[in-house]
């Protein structure tokens, strides 16, 4: 029997191991300054290591700050996205930050309005489609908002980020392990203010083999165009070199051509392995 569950909610009840879950908030000011804020939790299946965390990726400098918390300071609903880590609070509509440590001081509040989530239905419960019902998947993915407006401000290591009139994006990952390899890109800062895109391509273990699974969503004028493996989208062309990724997709009579270029300031985001979270994922906030 299929059971519809909100992808945004916490999936790590009963202290299952190995397990990780992280919510990715991208915040961009009206003049293009970007912060990524990722709260989450990790539990090793190899040892007793476990931690809650808040990760901050500074688009101005490429620096990544990773603050650990005791798991007892982590509290999240299993029916909706409402997360507390210490004195910090996270949801789709609101972020409250209050962290002061040796390396990081960040305080403030940002609210989100007019969110555009990937639709969740019984037969297509979010961006993973029917794959979301396969319990043996190593990693699950959810898109909480393709695009939304922001308000508020954050004081971050002596610098002020004013998010009045800014734009945001929220997604998340959870499961036992990250994919072996993947490419991911997202943007909702175009000259056309009603345009947002997210694209991911990964090697997905499947029984005794693997396949290339992908999720591409294009939001435009209140319509979400879905180019995905489970909708039988076809890759017509694909090319990757050290700086540029080109991809052509066909979904029935729709053709989408993507060209993604690396930026110049890479930050190493922390990601799970068998033992711990570590700086393993290069990401750019200044790509094209």
Locate predicted features.
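Structured soluble/peripheral alpha/beta segments that form catalytic or ligand/cofactor-binding pockets
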Residues: 1-288
């Amino acid at each position: 029997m299929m059971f519809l569950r909100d992808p945004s909610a916490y999936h790590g009840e009963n202290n299952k191991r190995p397990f990780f879950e992280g919510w990715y908030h991208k915040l961009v000011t009206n003049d293009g300054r970007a912060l990524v804020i990722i709260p989450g939790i990790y539990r090793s299946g190899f040892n007793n290591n476990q931690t809650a965390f808040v990760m901050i990726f500074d688009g101005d400098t490429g620096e990544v700050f990773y603050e650990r918390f005791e798991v007892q300071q982590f509290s999240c609903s299993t029916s909706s996205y409402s997360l507390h880590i210490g004195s910090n609070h996270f949801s789709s509509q609101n972020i409250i930050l209050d962290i002061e440590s040796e390396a990081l001081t960040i305080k403030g509040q940002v609210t989100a309005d007019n969110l555009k989530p990937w639709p969740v239905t019984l037969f297509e419960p979010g961006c993973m489609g029917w794959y979301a019902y396969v319990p043996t998947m190593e990693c699950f993915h959810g898109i909480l908002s393709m695009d939304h407006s922001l308000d508020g401000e954050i004081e971050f290591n002596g610098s002020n980020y004013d998010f009045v009139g800014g734009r945001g994006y929220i997604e998340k990952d959870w499961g036992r392990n990250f994919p072996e390899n993947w490419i991911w890109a997202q943007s909702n800062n175009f000259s056309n203010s009603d345009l947002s895109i997210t694209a991911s391509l990964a090697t997905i273990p499947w029984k005794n083999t693997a396949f290339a699974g992908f999720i591409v969503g294009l939001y435009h004028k209140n319509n979400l165009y879905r180019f995905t493996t489970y909708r039988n989208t076809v890759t017509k062309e694909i090319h990757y070199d050290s700086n540029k990724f080109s991809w052509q997709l066909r979904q029935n009579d729709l053709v989408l051509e993507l060209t993604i270029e690396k930026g110049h300031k890479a930050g190493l985001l922390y990601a799970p392995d068998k033992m711990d979270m570590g700086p393993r994922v290069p990401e750019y906030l200044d790509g094209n």
